[in-house]
Amino acid sequence: MVTPVRIAPTAAARARSLLRAVQYSHGPACPCHSSPSHHHQHVGSAINHAKRSLATPVDSFRQKEYAFEMAASSVRFGPGCTKEVGMDMKNLGAKKVIVVTDPNVVKLDAMKQVVEGLSKEGVEFVVFDKTRVEPKDYSIKEAIDFARPQNADAFLAVGGGSVIDTAKLMNLYTSFPDADFLDFVNAPLGRGLPITKPLKPLVAVPTTAGTGSETTGTAIFDLVSKKAKTGIAHRALKPTLGICDPINTRTMPSAVHASSGLDVLCHALESWTAIPYYERIPRPSNPIQRPAYQGANPISDIFSLQALRSTVQYLPRAVRDPDDFEAQSQMLLAATLAGVGFGNAGVHLCHGMSYPISSQNPGYHHHGYAVGGTPIIPHGVSVAVSAPSVFRFTGASNPERHLAAAEIFGVDVSRVKKSAAGEVLGEALAKFLVGLGDQPRGLKALGFGKEHVDELVEGTIPQARVLMLAPSLSAEVSEEREQLRGLFRDALEY
């Protein structure tokens, strides 16, 4: 990989960064950064930068990060490994388990394997099967209300990201029974309080290949009153174990393969192109305050790039051929790899913009999703629809990384100028999305128009947790609004 050049921040950029940190600070869970125009650089340069920072007395609030941490769930991967879950729960000392699933997965073989495994080991369990696809705050609260009187000592999630995220929050709020729902929700929509004690064991059995939620400390849902998608991010939410059994993804419809895979794609691309960890401020005064989303780092890079390679190679096959077990298996592995990558490096604009896209849905119902006739923009679709626009915009922040990504899509970049890196990657992404078939070619296809742009921008602004990792995005809010308006307009069609 070509070593990028670091551009030193100007005094104005540092001032803008400080202003943004003050405006959007939300405690220890909030990753933030300095000049968004910084380029990635190799580890040696980062070490020298840290030495200079440590040697120079400065305001601690403005000190940049000098370290990164890697955290992920334990993962077991292999066809048929679901049958071991009963032994896992027994090994964890669980006496009573809440099994969390949804109305569709409860009928599938994955749940049959779970029930048989728990019963065989004599582990008491109760099933909650009312999880909503793309959870709302009220559906999360219903799940928490179900869990509280059960006095369970472990949770077992069987399903896609919606199920796993719901189980994480059931675990959290039963462990903190006196907490208000907004206490742990990411600021500024919630209070962003830290999680101050370990939670109960949670084992996750994913049945989709997309969110990577089995490896991360993030749970996402719609905050209906604010017309915003938000969530809670903390290492304490991470599942104790992720059981990744490729057999469980064989029942996914083609549309779900596509949408889930697009989430993997953007997890990989966004974490690969996020600001580097050593440009994030403020440096935590205590390591326990280091956020889950820290910026790109040499270890997350490995996971993110491999996830991108696998997704480009195997997602089209998994979508086109329901009997391509190799492609399905590789996509489940890619989702897990990307989960480790973005679970530590973070995501940025595609995800930040996706939250208002899905929560402000003007009435679009994605083909292949059976949710009782309710309008739905699947998460992966809402993320990917802006991707060509986003990476055209971020290309100048680090041309080398954008060209490296374009090369994975099969682009010959040997004669491409660095100034064209964003355009080249954006074009490669658009071509890939069209090739998958049945994907909306921009926001217009979802029912959005120019008249919706301002509301979409206002729904994106509060997503400070991810926007602060976005390269090229201004730290000054009025300028940021204009940049986001341009991004949404550009994303209307591709």
Residue spans of the language-model regions?
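Generic secondary-structure signature for well-ordered alpha-helical cores
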Residues: K90, S119-V123, V133, R148-P149, ...
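Active-site segments that bind and position negatively charged phosphate/pyrophosphate groups
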Residues: Y277-A428
